[in-house]
């Protein structure tokens, strides 16, 4: 019995929209040689993905093919256009215009090459829902429209890589989207690279904001205040070296924040930048994730620690280069904390970790000074144990290796956290979890309800 060709038996619309639309366009083009029917299926494709992973013999021939195809399909709807390669500027602009005229919902420009775009291409577009500009550099040309002009009336998701534009045009790219819900900004450079982000995000509609801003070789990009005016923000992921100042409104709706506030390597005294305003603005969060360097930034450059009344879940990362100096004050300022998650127990040994740590070193008198400027007494950190008063019920440890220091730290947690109900431990792959479990079960545990789980 001969084998049945299930693919060819499918309806044309299913083949075009459900199968071919998921493939790189160059691969779709190659199917046109199979038969006349397969060539006609191109009319049903509503997603175009132009990239280099599927090479063709002649790039010029492909561009000519696309030119002819775009002309033929001028009346067909299109959902998504992705450009991830190097094509002539005129071809790129023509394909974008054609896609937008055909009701394009998603446009992605993402490649290792420069793209040059005239902002006028996007005028009068009422359909685009998702826009990604993440090429090596995207140069936007044009002028800001008259005040009050809406840019993308339907755009909900905007991703900006190295977008080079006049500050007013860059900011209008964000503020001109009245229903924008998710914004992603990536601006990373090295050497003498200049930043493209204007250090400003102003939007009343944004709910999710991710910013990665990293220029480690020069403090110049960080001398201006970072401005964030997003009253309806629910999620913030912010990764950057500390700026000299910040202008962040109180984020009343913020439920989750992920902070990676990096320390400057150019100085040894941590004397540049501050995070006080930013930390105060996020005091309403329920879930807070902090990198290891964020803990040090909280200690050195956050002068007034707010009370995190709504904080339920706190997770921190550890490494051997950074200490837990801010952890005691942070725990004492989180009266309703229920879950404490720690990725890696090994950290830099320093007496400033206080009673949150089992490996404190003996302080030198010349270093005994008050770091914070709030009205809390020094005894709040140096006297009252931040763990004994902490009402954490769940302790989650990942990357546990079972070293002597880690065992001591686990013993310290188990003896001090009196309200623990569950301890979840993720063990490194090379370790014997059963042996580590037996070892931990011999330790004193303050809470009679505590259940230790290895995951």
Curated annotation (Swiss-Prot):
<feature type="repeat" description="LRR 5">
    <location>
        <begin position="325"/>
        <end position="348"/>
    </location>
</feature>
<feature type="repeat" description="LRR 4">
    <location>
        <begin position="308"/>
        <end position="324"/>
    </location>
</feature>
<keyword id="KW-0433">Leucine-rich repeat</keyword>
<protein>
    <recommendedName>
        <fullName>F-box/LRR-repeat protein At5g35995</fullName>
    </recommendedName>
</protein>
<dbReference type="InterPro" id="IPR055294">
    <property type="entry name" value="FBL60-like"/>
</dbReference>
<dbReference type="InterPro" id="IPR036047">
    <property type="entry name" value="F-box-like_dom_sf"/>
</dbReference>
<dbReference type="InterPro" id="IPR001810">
    <property type="entry name" value="F-box_dom"/>
</dbReference>
<dbReference type="InterPro" id="IPR055411">
    <property type="entry name" value="LRR_FXL15/At3g58940/PEG3-like"/>
</dbReference>
<dbReference type="Pfam" id="PF00646">
    <property type="entry name" value="F-box"/>
</dbReference>
<feature type="repeat" description="LRR 3">
    <location>
        <begin position="282"/>
        <end position="305"/>
    </location>
</feature>
<feature type="repeat" description="LRR 2">
    <location>
        <begin position="152"/>
        <end position="176"/>
    </location>
</feature>
<feature type="repeat" description="LRR 1">
    <location>
        <begin position="114"/>
        <end position="138"/>
    </location>
</feature>
<dbReference type="InterPro" id="IPR006566">
    <property type="entry name" value="FBD"/>
</dbReference>
<dbReference type="InterPro" id="IPR053781">
    <property type="entry name" value="F-box_AtFBL13-like"/>
</dbReference>
<dbReference type="Pfam" id="PF24758">
    <property type="entry name" value="LRR_At5g56370"/>
</dbReference>
<keyword id="KW-0677">Repeat</keyword>
<feature type="domain" description="F-box">
    <location>
        <begin position="4"/>
        <end position="51"/>
    </location>
</feature>
